[in-house]
Amino acid sequence: MLKKKIPYITAILPAAGTGKRMKSLLPKQYCTIGDKTLIEHSMNALLCQSCIRHCIVVINARDHWFRQLSISYDPRVSVVVGGHTRADSVMAGLQHVKKSVWVIVHDAVRPCLHHEDLLRLFEITKFSQVGGILAIPICNTIKRTYCGTNFIRYTVNRENLWHALTPQLFNYDLLKYCLKKALKNRVTVTDEASALEYCGYKSIVIHGRSDNIKVTHQNDLKLANFYLSKLYKKT
């Protein structure tokens, strides 16, 4: 069988969040671990791959932090202004993609991405016409409560349930079409894969790692610091 080459890819990092859940005046993507911000760690994990030739960072209109970072001057990096939701911001990024068949979307506050996981995502997804995502099987017991209460209604069957992560890698034209349709119809999409699902397309799930965490609350910073220290020792 002939090997199929990994195509050139454009990366999009939605980074228009304002840090409300962190209860901080500083948006969480600019919190630091070591000598780098979370967004720099996340971008570096992507930009070290030769197949990623362009990285579009989508920021808030009032963001004055990103351009203070040295990585913002990397010739591969472009900056655009995002919207009110993640989907709006990703769509804003898609409008600035140039001549790329594939687009990879990664959370700006998910700094602990392993090189091996990224390569596995590339290797498996390149044979797909749609795309795929990193995810991990749900291992904890999941409870559903009655609406508006904290009373347990039932236990959710964990079989075939996965916790979606990023990066998520998709065919550019297909992602743009599906996201545009979802936004037009005011469908809530919490990640890129859900836009594809809405339009009836089947994405691939690629087994990721539980340490690929999204930093949402203050306590997550300590955990990310621990995971990153282990990751850098390994490399």
Curated annotation (Swiss-Prot):
GO molecular function list: 2-C-methyl-D-erythritol 4-phosphate cytidylyltransferase activity
Site for Transition state stabilizer, residues: R21, K28
InterPro entries: IspD, IspD/TarI, IspD/TarI_cytidylyltransf_bact, ISPD_synthase_CS, Nucleotide-diphossugar_trans
Domain of life: Bacteria
Catalytic activity: 2-C-methyl-D-erythritol 4-phosphate + CTP + H(+) = 4-CDP-2-C-methyl-D-erythritol + diphosphate
Pathway stated in the Swiss-Prot or TrEMBL entry: Isoprenoid biosynthesis; isopentenyl diphosphate biosynthesis via DXP pathway; isopentenyl diphosphate from 1-deoxy-D-xylulose 5-phosphate: step 2/6
GO aspect biological process, one term: isopentenyl diphosphate biosynthetic process, methylerythritol 4-phosphate pathway
Keyword vocabulary terms for this entry: Isoprene biosynthesis, Nucleotidyltransferase, Transferase
EC number from the UniProt entry: 2.7.7.60
PANTHER family reported for this sequence: 2-C-METHYL-D-ERYTHRITOL 4-PHOSPHATE CYTIDYLYLTRANSFERASE, CHLOROPLASTIC (PTHR32125:SF4)
Homology family: Belongs to the IspD/TarI cytidylyltransferase family. IspD subfamily.
Protein task: Catalyzes the formation of 4-diphosphocytidyl-2-C-methyl-D-erythritol from CTP and 2-C-methyl-D-erythritol 4-phosphate (MEP).
Description of how the protein assembles with itself and partners: Homodimer.
NCBIfam families in the record: ispD
UniProt protein name: 2-C-methyl-D-erythritol 4-phosphate cytidylyltransferase
Lineage, broadest ranks: Bacteria, Pseudomonadati, Pseudomonadota, Gammaproteobacteria, Enterobacterales
